[in-house]
Amino acid sequence: MEYIKKLLCTMSVLLLIIFIGGCGNMKDEQKKEEQTNKTDSKEEQIKKSFAKTLDMYPIKNLEDLYDKEGYRDGEFKKGDKGTWTISTDFAKSNKPGEMDSEGMVLHLNRNTRTATGYYTIRTTYDEVGKMTREKNYRVELKNNKIVLLDKVEDENLKHKIENFKFFGQYADFKDLKNYKNGRITINENVPYYEAEYKINNSDGNVKKLRENYPITAKKSPILKLHIDGDIKGSSVGYKQIEYTFSKEKEDETFMSDFLNFGPTKGGNND
């Protein structure tokens, strides 16, 4: 009898050790799962935050934005319908130590139903002290067409500006919700949030970018979704997408694009 008691006691202790160990493993697994869910949750929040504007792509007629409402907060003055800002910029390093970029920004005032902006050509240098070269050409939007307000002698440049298309006019993000396992970077003190995805060259948006720009890099690009500000919405911060085709110093290539809604600067009628 004493032998059986000792045996049962020993078995009970062993079972308890196994159970405690099992509970520890279960807790570890739960922690891992909770951490995964937390990461997935932020990833979903980032995508949902972007979907509020990317679901509008492609915007065939930019003047449709005059009738589109965006996120509003206490930064808006009474009666201000707000202003949409759309921008697309392409940058490429064509020489060691230099980065050339061209792009356009357009501000669409919903109060006055007018849109003005700039086409910018810029060269920046790695060399300390060497000043950035930049030239801005004023533009406006009339009947969904870009109209130059400055005289441009170069016919090729004039044609390029007048026929410029923002990425948002031909991009399509209907599959955004299917993007998975992104590389997530978060700093809630700033705050900012980023999700990065490797996108295949067969992707429709990537194909269109390669058609429209002199992209020589062959490898698949990285798509970055960047939020600066409250992930739930803010008129102070901004959201930007960026396709990086190459980070090689002599062939660095990327395209950045954003569509944001905010208070009209200077007043409702400016």
UniProtKB/Swiss-Prot annotation:
Lipid-modified residues of type N-palmitoyl cysteine are C23
Entry's PROSITE patterns? PROKAR_LIPOPROTEIN
Give one Pfam hit by family name. DUF576
Which Gene3D superfamilies does the record match to this protein? 2.50.20.40
Q: Which NCBIfam families match?
A: SA_tandem_lipo
Q: Which organism is it from?
A: Staphylococcus aureus (strain bovine RF122 / ET3-1)
Q: Where is the lipid attached (S-diacylglycerol cysteine)?
A: C23
Q: Which GO terms describe its cellular component?
A: plasma membrane
Signal peptide interval: 1-22
* Major subcellular location class: membrane
Descriptive protein name: Uncharacterized lipoprotein SAB0396
What does the sequence similarity comment in the record state about its family?
Answer: Belongs to the staphylococcal tandem lipoprotein family.
Membrane topology of the entry:
Lipid-anchor
Q: Which cellular compartments is it found in? A: Cell membrane
Which of UniProt's keywords are assigned here? Answer: Cell membrane, Lipoprotein, Membrane, Palmitate, Signal
